[in-house]
Amino acid sequence: MLSLLALAVAGPAAAQVWPVQREAEALAVDAAEVARTEGGTAEAALAELRAQGASVALTEWIEGAYRDRLAGLSLDTGGDVSVLLTGRKPVADMMAQAGEATVVVRFRTGAKATRDQLLAAIREHQAAIRAMLARPPAMGIDARRGELVIMIGGADAAGDREQLRKRIERLTDVPVRLAPADRPDGLLAGTAALDAPPSPLVGPVVPGGSQVMGPDPVNGRRYICTTGFAVSDGERTAIVTAAHCPDTLEHIATDGSRIPLPFVGQWGWGFQDVQVNLSPLADRAVFFADTARTQVRQVEHQRGRAATRVGDLVCHRGERSGYSCARVLMTDFAPSGDLCGGACLPMWVAVAGPSCRGGDSGGPIFIGTTAIGLLKGSSYRGDRSCGFYYYMPIDYLPEGWRLLTVPRP
């Protein structure tokens, strides 16, 4: 649910100036946040983040080489790769070079269904599974166990869970596990920087990771969301946020000044939740990552869903929750309810918090200076703390619009 924010009027203000982070500095900041959240040292976290980016080509090769048997692929803490295969024929572990890191690839066998079979089970039986339960559930694929995860709560969780699990398993003919709706427990078991530092960013500008506000046409209340990244259709520049945010939006700068953002369109069916609002001031490929919005990062790269692995570290900035980093839980996730103009497709990515709040919708998902996605929604525990959030991968931007990145040197 979006969060209500009181309307405030601000007068004119002087131009604002923000220092710009490049890739090396941005990764160091993210590594410090990972170390704070998970424990360990910032040095170890930084080494893992570098290996994470460098190992994408390796895991893409593994997925292609073992596609007929692949049940799941995930990253372990430290950056090693775990591969789960169907069948009993063993595959020897291997070591591979990923940038400066040596990555261990461990193979396990004995899974009962491939990833393709698990995805087909969601596509073919999602409606029937929803009909079995009091509330349409979220569902996704546990890449570590090779199981279809159905996330239930309330009356559904209070019933005969084992009988329900068996019913769904008979229907889908794949392994099924039921998990609490507020936490899918068990799922957690580039180019060189320029020699010269980037010039500071001088406002006014409409960056990603900042606040937008607009009225609900039905109840008249004003709601806040978070901007994602700057985009272009080749002629115009714009900023993206979530499609479920208000159509009519104003950008609220850190000094309180406001910039109208004319509405272009929204895409919110099945696998997308993205809205485009125009602004000539969204012509810089920059976004806020820090909670206080004191400095910006340039967008230097992008990484799509196919290159995202369970266990990857990603970060996000939300207008209400601020900045945090955590690990990917599922890359084949279908949110609960009818949040996608009906049932959602299993094409979203779920991340283990640790912070999310109403008003974060549309905010940037990133690591370092790499754009990864836009936050769609969150699941909360009974005490309203953040259980997990989920996002739309950046490669699902609407047709005709592309992500702005800094020019190559």
Model-based region annotation:
Residues 15, 38-48, 116-141, 147-238, ...:
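Protease-domain processing segments flanking chymotrypsin-fold serine proteases, especially trypsin-like
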Residues 16-84, 196-219, 409:
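Extracytoplasmic low-complexity, Pro/Thr/Ser/Ala/Gly-rich segments
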Residues 19-26, 32, 36, 46, ...:
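Short glycine/threonine-rich beta-strand-turn micro-motifs
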Residues 77, 85-89, 109, 143-145, ...:
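A mature extracytoplasmic/lumenal domain signature
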Residues 68, 77-80, 100, 134, ...:
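Extracytoplasmic
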Residues 187-409:
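Terminal interaction modules at protein C-ends
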Residues 2-3, 13:
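Cleavable N-terminal signal peptides
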